[in-house]
Amino acid sequence: MKILVIGAGPAGLVFASQLKQARPLWAIDIVEKNDEQEVLGWGVVLPGRPGQHPANPLSYLDAPERLNPQFLEDFKLVHHNEPSLMSTGVLLCGVERRGLVHALRDKCRSQGIAIRFESPLLEHGELPLADYDLVVLANGVNHKTAHFTEALVPQVDYGRNKYIWYGTSQLFDQMNLVFRTHGKDIFIAHAYKYSDTMSTFIVECSEETYARARLGEMSEEASAEYVAKVFQAELGGHGLVSQPGLGWRNFMTLSHDRCHDGKLVLLGDALQSGHFSIGHGTTMAVVVAQLLVKALCTEDGVPAALKRFEERALPLVQLFRGHADNSRVWFETVEERMHLSSAEFVQSFDARRKSLPPMPEALAQNLRYALQR
């Protein structure tokens, strides 16, 4: 079996590494459009402790402690400057995204999987399908699947809020969610530490707030300073740091009604992206990657494997989208609920996804199935 993985992010790397472990004689190549050092993002949240939770990609590394994971069990929601403290319900693990990606790449290389960077494959819209038995598209929300097959053209929707992903040297020992009224405007911050020295700090606001504050007219530095003043109570004098390519934008939800076509199969955000407010993106990437490994290892041939993979993965992907969309819309319409008491506000926040089957249980059930090979 000869397999090409497009995209050297968590989804493609976990898939390649786990499949190579299960089928060491199969040939697996990975190509990535960016250079080796170009990894966007600050911290990501993962479930459980490495080695104890198979949905945590750190569990597949030989020395996960080198990434200095941070463990979070408490959740703080601030509404009208009044904090409400809660339990996350599960142990969460914050880690630097760049460090995670580099460690997963090293793991693949140690297994004999070649990774080629700055690959022009996607730019030309042509894939060497004749050279491979399977091509895995795991190259994120900006993938150009439409160049390859009409059946996998994504459905793309944009959220109403603007958001930006910052880093900060202020350390947040809890999962923090802050709703801050600033004049006529409302800003929302999602913050948590991912190392001994840094935290993720995601900020979102309505299009109207973004326009009134003239954030689109500011430089990256001026915008970061403005937002830092809005959240000065939380940041305590620490600044906000931006990355090139992570400026203000509307959240893009990318979806598909199917997972594969011919030799092509989708993984990770290339299959389904989900709003950052539910925090399951990397976990989804791991679970769905394991489902594909399971199908390839237990079914007779690629067509049968992809059929079985879609039967298992698509319902999970659709549930993930439902949770993410419900959560995104709640945040986009939060102004309607800012008048509530803090207790009522927390209750509304907790209820925003209660109409759907629980996501953690669905992930756990599918992962247990995938690991029975």
Curated annotation (Swiss-Prot):
Keywords: Antibiotic biosynthesis, FAD, Flavoprotein, Monooxygenase, NAD, NADP, Oxidoreductase
Induction: By N-acylhomoserine lactone (AHL).
Record bears the keyword Flavoprotein: yes
Presence of keyword Transport: no
Uses in industry and biotechnology: Violacein production is used as a biosensor for the detection of quorum-sensing AHL production. Violacein possesses antibacterial, antiviral, antimicrobial, antileishmanial, trypanocidal and potential antitumoral activities.
Residues holding FAD: 2-20
BP terms from Gene Ontology: antibiotic biosynthetic process
Pathway: Pigment biosynthesis; violacein biosynthesis
Cofactor (UniProt): FAD
Signal peptide as annotated in the record: none
Catalysed conversion reaction: protodeoxyviolaceinate + NADH + O2 + H(+) = protoviolaceinate + NAD(+) + H2O; protodeoxyviolaceinate + NADPH + O2 + H(+) = protoviolaceinate + NADP(+) + H2O
GO MF annotation terms: monooxygenase activity
Role of this protein: Catalyzes the oxygenation of the 6-position of protodeoxyviolaceinate to form proviolacein.
Protein name: Protodeoxyviolaceinate monooxygenase
